[in-house]
Regions:
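A short Gly-Trp-Pro
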Residues: 1-126
Length: 126
């Protein structure tokens, strides 16, 4: 896991806030929200592969949404009761970066919607 000082140098203030302070970018503001290219979405902090473009869908929420992740063992899931809501937070298992949340209202085949901050991801085009 990278130390906080190194991450502050590497990341933009928004990327740091989202990944290290469990922040949330404004809806429809992220550069990956409407990305339609084929490729892999990686953790911006440690470069691990998290999501594939084949599982991305338009949810209308304003954040990149995926119905599945590449490897459930690569993501940590924990209950988040902040903001007077009960949600499931998702973070990168390798480095602990906050990614977003997962909700049980996605499309088939999983019925899940991983609602992920663009600021926590980088995209590698195929």
């Amino acid at each position: 896991m990278a130390n906080k000082d190194d991450l502050k140098k590497k990341l933009t203030p928004l990327e740091y806030h989202v990944t290290q302070e469990a922040g949330t970018e404004a809806p429809f503001s992220g550069d990956l929200h409407d990305c339609k290219l084929e490729g892999t979405y990686k953790c911006i902090c440690c470069d691990v592969n998290l999501f594939d473009s084949n599982s991305k869908f338009e949810s209308g929420t304003g954040w990149p949404s995926f119905f599945d992740c590449l490897d459930k063992d690569g993501i940590d899931f924990k209950e988040d009761t902040s903001h007077m809501m009960v949600r499931v937070e998702v973070s990168c298992k390798k480095c602990g970066a906050h990614l977003g949340h997962v909700f049980p209202d996605g499309p088939e085949p999983t019925g899940l919607r991983y609602c992920i901050n663009s600021a926590s991801l980088k995209f590698k085009k195929i």
